Protein backbone atom coordinates (compact mmCIF):
# COMPACT_ATOMS: atom_id res chain seq x y z
CA UNK A 1 0.00 0.00 0.00
CA UNK A 2 1.38 3.39 -0.93
CA UNK A 3 2.12 5.88 1.90
CA UNK A 4 -0.67 8.35 2.49
CA UNK A 5 -0.11 11.83 1.21
CA UNK A 6 0.27 14.87 3.46
CA UNK A 7 -3.33 16.07 3.01
CA UNK A 8 -4.44 12.66 4.33
CA UNK A 9 -2.48 13.24 7.53
CA UNK A 10 -4.41 16.34 8.41
CA UNK A 11 -7.38 18.14 6.89
CA UNK A 12 -7.95 21.80 7.58
CA UNK A 13 -11.05 22.73 9.50
CA UNK A 14 -11.93 25.18 6.76
CA UNK A 15 -12.38 22.23 4.40
CA UNK A 16 -14.03 19.78 6.81
CA UNK A 17 -15.81 21.96 9.32
CA UNK A 18 -19.62 21.95 9.45
CA UNK A 19 -21.46 24.90 7.98
CA UNK A 20 -23.47 27.01 10.39
CA UNK A 21 -27.12 27.41 9.53
CA UNK A 22 -29.01 30.61 10.05
CA UNK A 23 -31.25 30.81 13.06
CA UNK A 24 -29.47 28.02 14.97
CA UNK A 25 -27.00 28.24 17.78
CA UNK A 26 -23.52 27.24 16.56
CA UNK A 27 -22.30 23.87 17.86
CA UNK A 28 -19.11 23.85 19.93
CA UNK A 29 -16.09 22.55 18.08
CA UNK A 30 -14.92 19.12 19.28
CA UNK A 31 -11.69 17.24 18.94
CA UNK A 32 -13.33 14.67 16.68
CA UNK A 33 -14.06 17.47 14.19
CA UNK A 34 -10.37 18.12 13.55
CA UNK A 35 -8.65 14.85 14.50
CA UNK A 36 -7.30 12.38 11.97
CA UNK A 37 -7.55 8.60 12.45
CA UNK A 38 -5.56 5.90 10.67
CA UNK A 39 -6.18 2.27 10.08
CA UNK A 40 -3.48 -0.25 10.93
CA UNK A 41 -2.43 -0.43 7.24
CA UNK A 42 -2.18 3.34 6.93
CA UNK A 43 -0.22 3.63 10.18
CA UNK A 44 2.26 1.03 8.96
CA UNK A 45 2.97 3.05 5.81
CA UNK A 46 3.97 6.19 7.73
CA UNK A 47 7.64 7.04 8.13
CA UNK A 48 9.04 7.57 11.68
CA UNK A 49 9.37 11.31 11.05
CA UNK A 50 5.74 11.48 9.87
CA UNK A 51 4.56 9.61 12.96
CA UNK A 52 6.43 12.01 15.24
CA UNK A 53 5.00 15.00 13.41
CA UNK A 54 1.50 13.47 13.58
CA UNK A 55 1.78 13.12 17.37
CA UNK A 56 2.93 16.73 17.74
CA UNK A 57 0.12 18.06 15.52
CA UNK A 58 -2.61 16.13 17.36
CA UNK A 59 -1.32 17.21 20.77
CA UNK A 60 -1.04 20.82 19.68
CA UNK A 61 -4.57 20.72 18.24
CA UNK A 62 -5.94 19.28 21.47
CA UNK A 63 -4.12 21.99 23.41
CA UNK A 64 -5.62 24.72 21.22
CA UNK A 65 -9.09 23.33 21.82
CA UNK A 66 -8.40 23.33 25.54
CA UNK A 67 -7.40 26.99 25.36
CA UNK A 68 -10.73 27.71 23.64
CA UNK A 69 -12.68 25.71 26.24
CA UNK A 70 -13.72 23.05 23.73
CA UNK A 71 -11.49 20.15 24.79
CA UNK A 72 -13.96 18.08 26.86
CA UNK A 73 -12.86 14.69 28.22
CA UNK A 74 -9.50 13.41 27.03
CA UNK A 75 -10.01 11.37 23.84
CA UNK A 76 -8.64 7.85 23.60
CA UNK A 77 -6.46 8.95 20.69
CA UNK A 78 -4.61 11.47 22.87
CA UNK A 79 -4.14 8.88 25.61
CA UNK A 80 -2.64 6.49 23.09
CA UNK A 81 -0.34 9.14 21.64
CA UNK A 82 0.92 10.12 25.09
CA UNK A 83 2.20 6.57 25.57
CA UNK A 84 4.59 7.32 22.66
CA UNK A 85 4.48 3.86 21.15
CA UNK A 86 4.91 2.93 17.50
CA UNK A 87 2.67 -0.14 17.76
CA UNK A 88 -0.85 0.21 16.44
CA UNK A 89 -3.39 -0.48 19.22
CA UNK A 90 -6.96 -0.80 17.94
CA UNK A 91 -8.24 -1.28 21.48
CA UNK A 92 -6.88 2.14 22.42
CA UNK A 93 -9.41 3.87 20.16
CA UNK A 94 -13.04 4.29 21.14
CA UNK A 95 -15.11 2.53 18.42
CA UNK A 96 -17.96 4.97 18.96
CA UNK A 97 -15.58 7.87 18.53
CA UNK A 98 -14.22 6.35 15.33
CA UNK A 99 -17.74 5.81 13.94
CA UNK A 100 -18.61 9.46 14.65
CA UNK A 101 -15.54 10.52 12.73
CA UNK A 102 -16.41 8.30 9.75
CA UNK A 103 -19.97 9.71 9.71
CA UNK A 104 -18.61 13.22 9.89
CA UNK A 105 -16.26 12.59 6.94
CA UNK A 106 -19.17 11.30 4.85
CA UNK A 107 -21.16 14.45 5.54
CA UNK A 108 -18.12 16.52 4.66
CA UNK A 109 -17.67 14.80 1.31
CA UNK A 110 -21.34 15.30 0.44
CA UNK A 111 -21.04 18.97 1.42
CA UNK A 112 -17.96 19.38 -0.80
CA UNK A 113 -19.81 17.85 -3.75
CA UNK A 114 -22.65 20.33 -3.22
CA UNK A 115 -20.18 23.24 -3.17
CA UNK A 116 -18.53 21.98 -6.35
CA UNK A 117 -21.90 22.09 -8.08
CA UNK A 118 -22.26 25.73 -7.02
CA UNK A 119 -18.75 26.63 -8.15
CA UNK A 120 -18.83 24.63 -11.39
CA UNK A 121 -22.41 24.60 -12.74
CA UNK A 122 -23.48 21.60 -14.86
CA UNK A 123 -23.43 21.80 -18.62
CA UNK A 124 -26.56 23.14 -20.23
CA UNK A 125 -28.54 20.89 -22.59
CA UNK A 126 -28.30 21.85 -26.26
CA UNK A 127 -31.08 24.10 -27.44
CA UNK A 128 -33.58 22.76 -29.96
CA UNK A 129 -33.91 24.16 -33.44
CA UNK A 130 -30.19 24.95 -33.90
CA UNK A 131 -28.62 22.02 -35.66
CA UNK A 132 -24.92 21.85 -36.29
CA UNK A 133 -24.03 24.31 -33.48
CA UNK A 134 -22.54 23.19 -30.21
CA UNK A 135 -23.69 24.89 -27.03
CA UNK A 136 -21.22 27.38 -25.60
CA UNK A 137 -19.27 26.19 -22.58
CA UNK A 138 -20.16 27.86 -19.30
CA UNK A 139 -17.52 30.07 -17.71
CA UNK A 140 -15.96 28.43 -14.69
CA UNK A 141 -15.62 31.22 -12.15
CA UNK A 142 -14.75 29.99 -8.66
CA UNK A 143 -16.73 31.45 -5.82
CA UNK A 144 -14.70 33.83 -3.66
CA UNK A 145 -14.61 33.57 0.10
CA UNK A 146 -13.88 36.46 2.42
CA UNK A 147 -13.95 37.44 6.05
CA UNK A 148 -11.52 34.85 7.47
CA UNK A 149 -7.76 34.60 8.01
CA UNK A 150 -5.64 33.99 4.93
CA UNK A 151 -2.65 31.69 4.62
CA UNK A 152 0.39 33.81 3.65
CA UNK A 153 1.93 30.93 1.68
CA UNK A 154 -0.90 29.74 -0.59
CA UNK A 155 -3.54 32.48 -0.18
CA UNK A 156 -6.35 30.15 0.99
CA UNK A 157 -9.06 31.62 3.23
CA UNK A 158 -10.23 29.86 6.41
CA UNK A 159 -13.18 30.42 8.76
CA UNK A 160 -11.07 30.91 11.91
CA UNK A 161 -7.50 30.93 13.17
CA UNK A 162 -7.70 27.35 14.42
CA UNK A 163 -8.42 26.17 10.89
CA UNK A 164 -5.51 28.25 9.61
CA UNK A 165 -3.13 26.72 12.16
CA UNK A 166 -4.29 23.23 11.21
CA UNK A 167 -3.69 24.08 7.56
CA UNK A 168 -0.17 25.29 8.33
CA UNK A 169 0.54 22.05 10.16
CA UNK A 170 -0.57 20.16 7.05
CA UNK A 171 1.82 22.23 4.95
CA UNK A 172 4.61 21.44 7.40
CA UNK A 173 3.83 17.76 6.93
CA UNK A 174 4.37 18.21 3.21
CA UNK A 175 7.72 19.96 3.82
CA UNK A 176 9.16 18.56 7.06
CA UNK A 177 12.75 19.85 6.56
CA UNK A 178 13.20 23.52 7.62
CA UNK A 179 16.27 25.65 6.92
CA UNK A 180 17.86 26.76 10.22
CA UNK A 181 19.07 30.01 8.64
CA UNK A 182 15.92 31.45 7.03
CA UNK A 183 13.10 29.06 8.05
CA UNK A 184 12.20 28.00 4.51
CA UNK A 185 10.89 24.43 4.36
CA UNK A 186 11.60 21.65 1.87
CA UNK A 187 10.14 18.25 1.00
CA UNK A 188 13.44 16.35 0.76
CA UNK A 189 16.80 16.57 2.58
CA UNK A 190 18.63 16.92 -0.74
CA UNK A 191 16.70 20.11 -1.52
CA UNK A 192 17.57 21.49 1.91
CA UNK A 193 21.27 20.71 1.43
CA UNK A 194 21.23 22.43 -1.97
CA UNK A 195 19.44 25.46 -0.52
CA UNK A 196 21.86 25.88 2.41
CA UNK A 197 24.68 26.50 -0.06
CA UNK A 198 23.00 29.85 -0.76
CA UNK A 199 23.80 30.90 2.82
CA UNK A 200 27.24 29.32 3.09
CA UNK A 201 28.45 30.37 -0.37
CA UNK A 202 29.68 26.85 -1.18
CA UNK A 203 30.04 26.20 -4.93
CA UNK A 204 31.08 22.57 -5.58
CA UNK A 205 30.25 22.46 -9.31
CA UNK A 206 32.97 23.84 -11.62
CA UNK A 207 32.70 24.72 -15.31
CA UNK A 208 35.38 22.98 -17.41
CA UNK A 209 35.55 25.85 -19.89
CA UNK A 210 36.06 28.93 -17.70
CA UNK A 211 36.46 27.62 -14.15
CA UNK A 212 33.34 29.35 -12.85
CA UNK A 213 31.78 27.66 -9.82
CA UNK A 214 28.12 27.04 -8.95
CA UNK A 215 26.18 25.83 -5.94
CA UNK A 216 23.76 23.65 -7.93
CA UNK A 217 24.24 21.30 -10.85
CA UNK A 218 21.32 22.79 -12.79
CA UNK A 219 22.94 26.24 -12.60
CA UNK A 220 26.12 24.77 -14.07
CA UNK A 221 24.11 23.21 -16.91
CA UNK A 222 22.42 26.54 -17.61
CA UNK A 223 25.79 28.31 -17.57
CA UNK A 224 27.37 25.90 -20.05
CA UNK A 225 24.84 27.04 -22.63
CA UNK A 226 26.76 30.35 -22.70
CA UNK A 227 29.78 28.56 -24.19
CA UNK A 228 27.71 26.64 -26.74
CA UNK A 229 25.67 29.72 -27.69
CA UNK A 230 22.43 27.76 -27.64
CA UNK A 231 19.20 29.65 -26.88
CA UNK A 232 16.38 27.10 -27.01
CA UNK A 233 13.55 29.27 -25.64
CA UNK A 234 11.82 31.48 -28.23
CA UNK A 235 9.33 34.26 -27.56
CA UNK A 236 6.23 33.69 -29.74
CA UNK A 237 5.47 37.42 -29.76
CA UNK A 238 8.73 38.96 -30.97
CA UNK A 239 10.95 35.97 -31.79
CA UNK A 240 13.65 36.83 -29.26
CA UNK A 241 15.55 33.80 -27.91
CA UNK A 242 16.69 33.05 -24.37
CA UNK A 243 18.89 30.50 -22.66
CA UNK A 244 16.53 29.93 -19.73
CA UNK A 245 12.81 29.35 -19.56
CA UNK A 246 12.59 31.71 -16.59
CA UNK A 247 14.19 34.50 -18.65
CA UNK A 248 11.58 33.92 -21.35
CA UNK A 249 8.78 34.05 -18.78
CA UNK A 250 10.11 37.32 -17.37
CA UNK A 251 10.45 38.73 -20.88
CA UNK A 252 6.88 37.89 -21.87
CA UNK A 253 5.56 40.16 -19.12
CA UNK A 254 6.91 43.07 -21.18
CA UNK A 255 4.31 42.19 -23.83
CA UNK A 256 1.39 41.57 -21.49
CA UNK A 257 2.32 44.14 -18.83
CA UNK A 258 0.76 41.91 -16.18
CA UNK A 259 2.04 42.40 -12.62
CA UNK A 260 -0.33 40.59 -10.26
CA UNK A 261 1.88 40.55 -7.15
CA UNK A 262 1.72 43.76 -5.09
CA UNK A 263 3.95 44.81 -2.21
CA UNK A 264 1.80 45.44 0.89
CA UNK A 265 4.25 48.06 2.20
CA UNK A 266 4.65 50.43 -0.76
CA UNK A 267 2.12 49.17 -3.33
CA UNK A 268 4.72 48.41 -6.01
CA UNK A 269 3.69 45.54 -8.28
CA UNK A 270 5.75 42.67 -9.69
CA UNK A 271 5.26 39.97 -12.28
CA UNK A 272 6.51 37.08 -10.12
CA UNK A 273 6.49 36.20 -6.40
CA UNK A 274 10.28 35.79 -6.41
CA UNK A 275 10.74 39.42 -7.50
CA UNK A 276 8.31 40.53 -4.81
CA UNK A 277 10.20 38.54 -2.16
CA UNK A 278 13.49 40.18 -3.16
CA UNK A 279 11.86 43.63 -3.11
CA UNK A 280 10.37 43.13 0.35
CA UNK A 281 13.87 42.73 1.77
CA UNK A 282 14.34 46.46 1.17
CA UNK A 283 11.58 47.08 3.73
CA UNK A 284 12.59 44.40 6.25
CA UNK A 285 16.33 44.97 5.92
CA UNK A 286 16.94 41.23 5.54
CA UNK A 287 20.26 40.25 3.97
CA UNK A 288 20.41 36.44 3.94
CA UNK A 289 23.51 36.01 1.75
CA UNK A 290 26.87 36.34 3.53
CA UNK A 291 30.36 36.55 2.05
CA UNK A 292 32.69 34.04 3.74
CA UNK A 293 35.76 36.22 3.14
CA UNK A 294 34.67 39.55 4.67
CA UNK A 295 31.27 38.72 6.30
CA UNK A 296 29.50 41.34 4.20
CA UNK A 297 25.81 40.57 3.69
CA UNK A 298 23.59 41.03 0.62
CA UNK A 299 19.90 40.89 -0.24
CA UNK A 300 20.35 39.02 -3.51
CA UNK A 301 22.48 36.04 -4.38
CA UNK A 302 23.59 37.66 -7.65
CA UNK A 303 25.00 40.60 -5.68
CA UNK A 304 26.96 38.17 -3.51
CA UNK A 305 28.37 36.39 -6.57
CA UNK A 306 29.51 39.69 -8.11
CA UNK A 307 31.02 40.79 -4.79
CA UNK A 308 32.99 37.54 -4.38
CA UNK A 309 34.81 38.32 -7.62
CA UNK A 310 36.55 41.14 -5.76
CA UNK A 311 38.28 38.51 -3.62
CA UNK A 312 38.92 36.04 -6.43
CA UNK A 313 39.88 38.67 -9.02
CA UNK A 314 37.62 37.01 -11.58
CA UNK A 315 36.51 39.20 -14.50
CA UNK A 316 34.63 36.95 -16.93
CA UNK A 317 33.20 39.70 -19.18
CA UNK A 318 35.76 41.07 -21.71
CA UNK A 319 35.22 44.15 -23.85
CA UNK A 320 35.57 43.24 -27.56
CA UNK A 321 36.78 46.77 -28.41
CA UNK A 322 39.60 47.36 -25.93
CA UNK A 323 40.07 43.93 -24.26
CA UNK A 324 39.34 45.39 -20.84
CA UNK A 325 37.56 42.90 -18.54
CA UNK A 326 34.75 43.38 -16.00
CA UNK A 327 33.29 41.43 -13.11
CA UNK A 328 29.63 41.88 -14.15
CA UNK A 329 27.73 42.15 -17.41
CA UNK A 330 26.10 45.42 -16.34
CA UNK A 331 29.50 47.09 -15.95
CA UNK A 332 30.51 45.82 -19.37
CA UNK A 333 27.35 47.29 -20.93
CA UNK A 334 28.04 50.62 -19.23
CA UNK A 335 31.66 50.58 -20.41
CA UNK A 336 30.82 49.84 -24.04
CA UNK A 337 28.94 53.13 -24.23
CA UNK A 338 32.36 54.81 -24.07
CA UNK A 339 33.21 53.29 -27.45
CA UNK A 340 29.79 53.68 -29.05
CA UNK A 341 29.19 57.20 -27.74
CA UNK A 342 25.68 56.26 -26.60
CA UNK A 343 24.25 58.55 -23.91
CA UNK A 344 20.75 57.29 -23.03
CA UNK A 345 20.31 59.32 -19.83
CA UNK A 346 19.22 62.93 -20.41
CA UNK A 347 18.93 65.74 -17.88
CA UNK A 348 15.50 67.35 -17.85
CA UNK A 349 16.87 70.76 -16.83
CA UNK A 350 19.69 71.42 -19.29
CA UNK A 351 19.38 68.59 -21.87
CA UNK A 352 22.83 67.22 -21.01
CA UNK A 353 23.15 63.50 -21.74
CA UNK A 354 25.18 60.83 -19.96
CA UNK A 355 26.17 57.24 -20.56
CA UNK A 356 25.50 56.13 -16.97
CA UNK A 357 22.57 56.76 -14.67
CA UNK A 358 24.86 57.38 -11.70
CA UNK A 359 26.58 60.18 -13.61
CA UNK A 360 23.18 61.74 -14.36
CA UNK A 361 22.24 61.66 -10.68
CA UNK A 362 25.52 63.34 -9.76
CA UNK A 363 24.95 65.96 -12.45
CA UNK A 364 21.47 66.77 -11.20
CA UNK A 365 23.00 67.84 -7.89
CA UNK A 366 24.40 70.84 -9.79
CA UNK A 367 20.85 72.05 -10.44
CA UNK A 368 19.55 71.37 -6.95
CA UNK A 369 22.69 72.60 -5.19
CA UNK A 370 22.59 69.57 -2.89
CA UNK A 371 25.84 68.33 -1.37
CA UNK A 372 24.98 65.17 0.57
CA UNK A 373 28.51 64.25 1.74
CA UNK A 374 29.67 66.51 4.61
CA UNK A 375 33.14 66.32 6.12
CA UNK A 376 32.91 65.33 9.82
CA UNK A 377 36.08 67.30 10.60
CA UNK A 378 35.37 70.74 9.12
CA UNK A 379 31.74 70.53 7.95
CA UNK A 380 32.52 71.18 4.29
CA UNK A 381 30.07 69.35 2.02
CA UNK A 382 30.68 67.61 -1.30
CA UNK A 383 28.54 66.21 -4.09
CA UNK A 384 30.53 62.98 -4.43
CA UNK A 385 31.81 60.50 -1.89
CA UNK A 386 35.12 60.27 -3.75
CA UNK A 387 35.64 64.02 -3.42
CA UNK A 388 35.00 63.75 0.31
CA UNK A 389 37.54 60.93 0.65
CA UNK A 390 40.21 62.98 -1.14
CA UNK A 391 39.38 66.04 0.99
CA UNK A 392 39.68 64.14 4.28
CA UNK A 393 43.30 63.34 3.46
CA UNK A 394 44.03 67.07 3.94
CA UNK A 395 43.03 66.74 7.61
CA UNK A 396 44.98 63.58 8.34
CA UNK A 397 47.95 64.67 6.17
CA UNK A 398 48.46 61.00 5.47
CA UNK A 399 50.07 60.65 2.04
CA UNK A 400 51.69 57.26 1.86
CA UNK A 401 52.30 57.14 -1.89
CA UNK A 402 55.36 59.09 -3.07
CA UNK A 403 56.50 59.83 -6.62
CA UNK A 404 59.93 58.35 -7.42
CA UNK A 405 60.80 61.17 -9.83
CA UNK A 406 59.94 64.33 -7.87
CA UNK A 407 59.15 63.08 -4.36
CA UNK A 408 55.62 64.47 -4.32
CA UNK A 409 53.31 62.43 -2.12
CA UNK A 410 49.69 61.45 -2.68
CA UNK A 411 46.93 59.99 -0.56
CA UNK A 412 45.77 57.40 -3.10
CA UNK A 413 47.53 55.16 -5.63
CA UNK A 414 45.20 56.38 -8.40
CA UNK A 415 46.36 59.98 -7.88
CA UNK A 416 49.99 58.87 -7.96
CA UNK A 417 49.43 56.91 -11.18
CA UNK A 418 47.78 59.93 -12.80
CA UNK A 419 50.65 62.19 -11.66
CA UNK A 420 53.41 59.93 -12.99
CA UNK A 421 52.10 60.40 -16.52
CA UNK A 422 53.42 63.96 -16.27
CA UNK A 423 56.95 62.57 -16.11
CA UNK A 424 56.51 59.70 -18.56
CA UNK A 425 54.48 61.65 -21.11
CA UNK A 426 52.03 58.76 -21.44
CA UNK A 427 48.64 59.66 -22.88
CA UNK A 428 46.47 56.52 -22.92
CA UNK A 429 43.12 58.23 -23.58
CA UNK A 430 42.45 59.07 -27.24
CA UNK A 431 39.53 60.96 -28.78
CA UNK A 432 37.62 58.88 -31.31
CA UNK A 433 36.78 61.91 -33.47
CA UNK A 434 40.07 63.80 -33.79
CA UNK A 435 42.64 61.29 -32.38
CA UNK A 436 43.90 63.80 -29.83
CA UNK A 437 45.33 62.05 -26.77
CA UNK A 438 45.20 62.91 -23.09
CA UNK A 439 46.92 61.79 -19.90
CA UNK A 440 43.75 61.72 -17.79
CA UNK A 441 40.25 60.46 -18.44
CA UNK A 442 38.71 63.65 -17.08
CA UNK A 443 40.62 65.73 -19.66
CA UNK A 444 39.31 63.52 -22.47
CA UNK A 445 35.75 63.89 -21.17
CA UNK A 446 36.10 67.68 -21.15
CA UNK A 447 37.56 67.64 -24.65
CA UNK A 448 34.71 65.53 -26.05
CA UNK A 449 32.28 68.27 -25.01
CA UNK A 450 33.76 70.38 -27.83
CA UNK A 451 32.52 67.83 -30.37
CA UNK A 452 29.12 67.22 -28.79
CA UNK A 453 28.46 70.86 -27.88
CA UNK A 454 27.36 69.78 -24.42
CA UNK A 455 27.59 72.27 -21.55
CA UNK A 456 26.80 70.35 -18.38
CA UNK A 457 27.52 73.08 -15.80
CA UNK A 458 24.60 75.55 -15.55
CA UNK A 459 24.47 78.76 -13.56
CA UNK A 460 21.57 78.60 -11.12
CA UNK A 461 21.08 82.38 -11.20
CA UNK A 462 20.97 83.18 -14.92
CA UNK A 463 20.68 79.74 -16.54
CA UNK A 464 23.83 80.10 -18.64
CA UNK A 465 25.71 76.80 -19.18
CA UNK A 466 29.43 76.08 -19.36
CA UNK A 467 31.56 73.19 -20.52
CA UNK A 468 33.96 73.24 -17.58
CA UNK A 469 33.46 73.66 -13.87
CA UNK A 470 36.13 76.35 -13.52
CA UNK A 471 34.41 78.42 -16.24
CA UNK A 472 31.27 78.37 -14.12
CA UNK A 473 33.30 79.40 -11.07
CA UNK A 474 34.80 82.35 -12.98
CA UNK A 475 31.32 83.33 -14.18
CA UNK A 476 30.00 83.38 -10.61
CA UNK A 477 32.85 85.64 -9.50
CA UNK A 478 32.42 88.01 -12.47
CA UNK A 479 28.73 88.01 -13.48
CA UNK A 480 27.37 89.75 -16.56
CA UNK A 481 26.96 93.50 -16.64
CA UNK A 482 23.39 94.96 -16.76
CA UNK A 483 23.49 95.41 -20.55
CA UNK A 484 24.15 91.72 -21.07
CA UNK A 485 27.84 91.85 -22.08
CA UNK A 486 30.36 89.98 -19.96
CA UNK A 487 32.18 92.00 -17.36
CA UNK A 488 35.89 92.15 -18.36
CA UNK A 489 38.39 90.34 -16.18
CA UNK A 490 41.17 92.22 -14.44
CA UNK A 491 44.12 92.44 -16.80
CA UNK A 492 41.99 91.27 -19.73
CA UNK A 493 42.26 92.39 -23.35
CA UNK A 494 39.66 95.18 -22.97
CA UNK A 495 41.62 96.87 -20.19
CA UNK A 496 44.89 96.63 -22.10
CA UNK A 497 43.30 98.18 -25.24
CA UNK A 498 41.79 101.03 -23.23
CA UNK A 499 45.11 101.69 -21.61
CA UNK A 500 46.68 102.12 -25.02
Curated annotation (Swiss-Prot):
Which biological process annotations from GO are given for this protein?
A: regulation of DNA-templated transcription; skeletal muscle cell differentiation
- Which segments does the record annotate as C2H2-type zinc fingers? 149-171, 177-199, 205-227, 233-255, 261-283, 289-311, 317-339, 345-367, 373-395, 401-423, 429-451, 457-483
Which keywords label this protein? DNA-binding, Isopeptide bond, Metal-binding, Nucleus, Repeat, Transcription, Transcription regulation, Ubl conjugation, Zinc, Zinc-finger
Q: Output the Gene Ontology cellular-component terms.
A: nucleus
Q: Which PROSITE patterns match?
A: KRAB (PS50805), ZINC_FINGER_C2H2_1 (PS00028), ZINC_FINGER_C2H2_2 (PS50157)
**Which InterPro entries does the UniProt entry name for this protein?**
KRAB (IPR001909), KRAB_dom_sf (IPR036051), Snail/Krueppel_Znf (IPR050527), Znf_C2H2_sf (IPR036236), Znf_C2H2_type (IPR013087)
Name the segments for region: Disordered: 105-144
Family label: Belongs to the krueppel C2H2-type zinc-finger protein family.
State the name under which the record lists this protein: Zinc finger protein 689
From which source organism is this entry? Mus musculus
Amino acid sequence: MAPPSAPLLLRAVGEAGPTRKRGRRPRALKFVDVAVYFSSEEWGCLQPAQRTLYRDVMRETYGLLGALGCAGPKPALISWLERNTDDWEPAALDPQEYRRWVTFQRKTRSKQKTEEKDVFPPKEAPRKGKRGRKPSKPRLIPRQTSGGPICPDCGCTFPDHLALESHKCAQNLKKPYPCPDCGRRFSYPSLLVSHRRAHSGECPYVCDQCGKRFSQRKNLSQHQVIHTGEKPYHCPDCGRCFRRSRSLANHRTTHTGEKPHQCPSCGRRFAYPSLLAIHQRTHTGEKPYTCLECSRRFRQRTALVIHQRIHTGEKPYPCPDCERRFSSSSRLVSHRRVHSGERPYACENCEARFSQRSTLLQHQLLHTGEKPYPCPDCGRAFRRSGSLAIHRSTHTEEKLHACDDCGRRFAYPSLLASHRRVHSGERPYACDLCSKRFAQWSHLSQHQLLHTGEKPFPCLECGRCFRQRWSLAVHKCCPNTPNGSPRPLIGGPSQRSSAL
